[in-house]
Regions:
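Conserved AAA+ ATPase core "coupling" helix
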Residues: 166-177
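Short beta-strand segments
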Residues: 14-16, 39-41, 106-109, 137-140, ...
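Phosphate/oxyanion-binding loops and surfaces in catalytic or ligand/nucleic-acid-binding neighborhoods
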Residues: 32, 59-66, 98, 113, ...
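Walker A/P-loop-proximal flanking segment of P-loop NTPase domains
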Residues: 1-18, 24, 28-29
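Loop-to-helix "switch" segment enriched in basic
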Residues: 152-153, 157-163, 168, 182-233
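Conserved phosphate-binding/catalytic loops and adjacent sensor/switch elements of nucleotide-binding enzymes
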Residues: 20, 25-102, 112-114
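A conserved switch/coupling segment of P-loop NTPase cores
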Residues: 3-7, 31-34, 84-165, 180
Length: 233
């Protein structure tokens, strides 16, 4: 689905709760997409327009050193609502003018600044204008606001929600089999985690570690006690 979105849309939003597998999916795709990757992990302190763009621009300049930040940061520093659309247009212009490989811009945890008044107007102007060699991939714990959601009908935005991210029972069995675990163990883990990717993977790793430790434990009671004492030291 991400590959299809990369080819047909300008942007993708991966939405789901903590542990749904958003970051894992974004990381795997960034590794195989064949593009340079600018990665910005948003923090709650980035709510201020100027701060957000400082980090976003810095991530892009790591991959495109010639990316011109001067006009962007001048507008971002002014922090006026009537500058937002102009800011989006200048940002796109600099992406068009800049030289470099095709680019994937990953904005992780955008929900951290979802209450910012400038965010939706900026994205609604910015995402549809992106050049073909730039794709924006957003991860968020919240679904896109209504104005962004409507962009799906214009083939500008692809949304991958938690239901799409979740493992099916069959996929859970396949995952557990790679750790040498049974389908019964996979079924119980699936029921506990509701198929959430990170939680399911954690269960598989933990059960495999427990199985390996039990398998390697000495059979002789004396040896077993000595081994337990060694681990306690």
């Amino acid at each position: 689905m991400l590959r299809s979105s990369l080819e047909s849309c300008t942007s993708t939003v991966i939405s789901g709760r903590a542990g749904a597998g958003k970051t894992a999916l974004a990381t795997d795709f960034a590794r195989i997409c064949g593009r340079s990757v600018a990665w910005y992990k948003v923090d709650a302190a980035d709510l201020e327009l100027r701060v957000f763009f400082e980090y976003l621009v810095a991530s892009i300049r790591q991959e495109r050193p010639g990316f011109n930040e001067q006009n962007i940061m001048a507008l971002a520093g002014a922090a006026k609502s009537d500058h937002i659309l102009r800011l989006a247009e200048i940002f796109v212009y600099e992406l068009l003018e800049g030289e470099g490989n095709p680019l994937l811009i990953v904005i992780e945890d955008l929900h951290q600044v979802c209450d910012a008044e400038w965010l939706v107007p900026f994205l609604c102007r910015f995402l549809p204008l992106l050049p073909r060699d730039v794709h924006v991939l957003i991860t968020s714990r919240t679904l896109p606001p209504a104005p962004l959601w409507r962009m799906r009908s214009k083939q500008t935005l692809e949304v991958i929600d938690e239901a799409t991210l979740a493992f099916t029972p069959e996929e859970a069995v396949e995952l557990f089999e790679t750790y040498g675990l049974s389908s019964e163990q996979a079924r119980h883990a699936f029921e506990r985690t509701h198929g959430r990717a990170a939680a399911l993977a954690t269960q598989a790793v933990a059960q495999n570690k427990s199985r390996t430790a039990h398998k390697n434990r000495p059979n002789d009671p004396v040896e077993r006690r000595l081994a337990d004492q060694d681990r306690a030291l």
